[in-house]
Each structure stands twice: as C-alpha cells, then as structure tokens.
UniProtKB/Swiss-Prot annotation:
The keyword Oxidoreductase applies. This is tRNA uridine(34) hydroxylase. One of its GO terms (molecular function) is oxidoreductase activity, acting on paired donors, with incorporation or reduction of molecular oxygen. Residues 145-239 form the Rhodanese domain. Catalyzes oxygen-dependent 5-hydroxyuridine (ho5U) modification at position 34 in tRNAs. Transmembrane segments: none annotated.
C-alpha cells in the first residue's frame, strides 16, 4: 500500500522549494457540498496532486472542500480538467489565481476536517447552501459609493490591519468562529439594510452570508471569489481597484500587494509598514508588523526580551558546535 502523506523533513522540503526554478501558479478554491466518504475522497486527491508535484494545503470535510495550492504551470490545465471531472459537484469549479506567484508552499498536506472552515455553528436547521447574492467588481464599486450600503470585513484583525476596503467595518477577532458570534450582535440594527461581506477568497464570507440570512438579515451580498476575485475582475474590465493596501495570505508569502497605500504601522516604532514576520525567537513566534529599521535593531524579534533570549540561544548553539 502506497504512503499517502509526506515523509520528507521540513528542512529538506524548504530547501527544495528555495532552489526550484520551475514556474508555478498559486491557486485557491472551495465548494460547500456533501462528501459521503471523506477518507476515500482525500486519498484520491492526494494521489493525483502528488503525481503532478502539487504543494499546498487541502481540507476535506463532509461539508465540502477548501484548498490553497501551488501548481507547476505546465500542469495547470491538466489539474483543472482533473478537478472538473473528479466530482460532478466540482464541474466548472471557480478557481482563484493568486495576484502573484512567489513561492507559496513547500509541502503537500491533504487533511480530513470536521468542517472546511471552523465556524462554531451548532444549529441543526442551519443551511450553508442558502447564501447571499454574489456581486462582481462593477457592482462592488457602485455599492462602495452608496452610503446606505454597509461593508463588513470577515477576516481576522491582523488581516484587516494591512488592507481593507475604505470604511469597511472590522469585526475585531482572531478567529472566524468568534466573528460569527459578534457580527449578529453588532449589526442587529441593520437587518433591513444592504450588507456586503467579504474575505480573501470567498469561503468565509459565503458562510457568513448564510449565517446572516439564518438570523433574519434581509439583504446580504458577498464578493464572488472574495478580494482575489474582485481584483482580477476589476483589472480585467478596466475598473478602479478600491481595495487599499495588501491582502494577507496564509502561506509562505504572507501577503499580496494590491495597491501602493501602506495603511498599517510597525509594532515597535509606529512607522508606516505592512511587512508581517514571525518573531525570530522560536519559543515566541509572534506574528507582527515590523519595519526595516526595527528588523535590524531587534534582530527580527518582537521585543528586547525576545531579542536577548534569541541571542542567548544562538550563542549556546555556536558554543556547542565549537565543543564538537
């Protein structure tokens, strides 16, 4: 029986990614639909993705599939056809192409999950297929200029920090589950108003529109393909892109630049910056925004305390190497 999971070390996989020269496309897709045998579904996907050197993260659950992947450009058409024929539910699946194609993933991981996005919803009669109205770039821009329409950002606070639509409401939270609880309470006054919800690729805002409709909101819309889909559609049709800043992404790139505006600030000095890093001291690993000057000053650490611990750790490692 073949091994259907990665057995190569993280260090080696990262080395391979760094030296790879083959052009790749970073893609994302999702679909809410019922999957009866998730294990069989997962294994079939893994075999084909592995065969074509696909890297990335794919979640399979009884409620559907959610994927962010890096595909060799030469295999894109083959894999697109494979997905369309893999399951009738995936026929004409919307596949988002990232705005850039830097090295995004270094391992293939296909996991079975209880849900493809953790929402905390336990209501028995909730129907995730009853969703809001899809809108594309022209209508998005028109509604952004309508003061009676409310835009709600359904991403985490750290995503909102580096980029968002102007005047969009931030539902402050670090989890989607928490946001769904808050948004119903915070927007209770707007049940009869037009509400537009958005996220990176569409998966969270689609479920959020279902949740809003379930809770009695009347006029709920969401961006087809999320921020990524909006930007592609606006550029394709020669329309202004009204999203400001960067779009946070959950892979090695950390973000995609959409506009030239820098709307966030360095955690340490307050200077304009939109570069996320993880604290160099591995026991901390805090995700935070740091400018170039502070990166040098703090050795890519989030604080003086972490910098001291990091230096001490590195010194000990050097001494161990010398002793050998």
């Amino acid at each position: 029986m073949s091994i259907l999971h990665n057995i190569v070390s993280k260090k080696e996989l990262k080395r391979r990614m760094f030296f790879e020269t083959e052009p790749r496309l970073t893609l994302s897709f999702y679909k809410y639909f019922f999957i009866k045998n998730t294990q069989e579904y997962r294994d079939r996907l893994y075999k084909t993705f592995y065969k074509y050197n696909v890297l990335g993260r794919i979640y399979v659950a009884s409620e559907g599939i959610n994927a962010q992947i890096s595909v060799p450009k030469k295999y894109y058409s083959i894999l697109k056809k494979f997905l369309y024929n893999f399951d009738i539910e995936l026929n004409n699946l919307r596949i988002n192409k990232s705005l850039d194609n830097e090295k995004s993933f270094w391992v293939l991981c296909v996991k079975i999950k209880k849900k493809i996005v953790q929402d905390g919803i336990k209501e028995h009669f909730f129907n995730p297929n009853n969703v809001g109205i899809y809108i594309q770039s022209e209508q998005v821009n028109s509604m952004l200029n309508d003061k009676k329409t409310i835009f709600i950002d359904m991403r985490n606070s750290y995503e909102y920090a580096i980029g968002h639509f102007e005047n969009a409401i931030e539902i402050k939270s670090i989890t989607f589950r928490e946001q769904l609880k808050k948004v119903i309470q915070l927007m209770a006054y707007a049940k009869n108003k037009k509400i537009v919800m958005y996220c990176t690729g569409g998966i969270r805002c689609e479920k959020a529109t279902s949740w809003m409709l379930f809770n009695g909101f009347k006029h709920v819309y969401h961006l087809e393909g999320g921020i990524i889909g909006y930007v592609h559609d606006a550029r394709k049709n020669g329309l202004p892109v009204l999203f400001k800043g960067k779009s946070f992404v959950f892979d090695n790139r950390m973000s995609e630049k959409i506009s030239d505006e820098v709307i966030s600030y360095c955690k340490q000095c307050g200077k304009s910056s939109d570069v996320y890093i993880n604290c160099k001291y591995s026991s901390c690993h805090l995700l935070f925004i740091q400018c170039e000057n502070c990166s040098v000053k703090f050795h890519s650490c989030c604080s003086l305390e972490c910098m001291k611990k990091y230096k001490f750790y590195m010194l000990n490692n050097d001494l161990k190497k010398i002793s050998y």
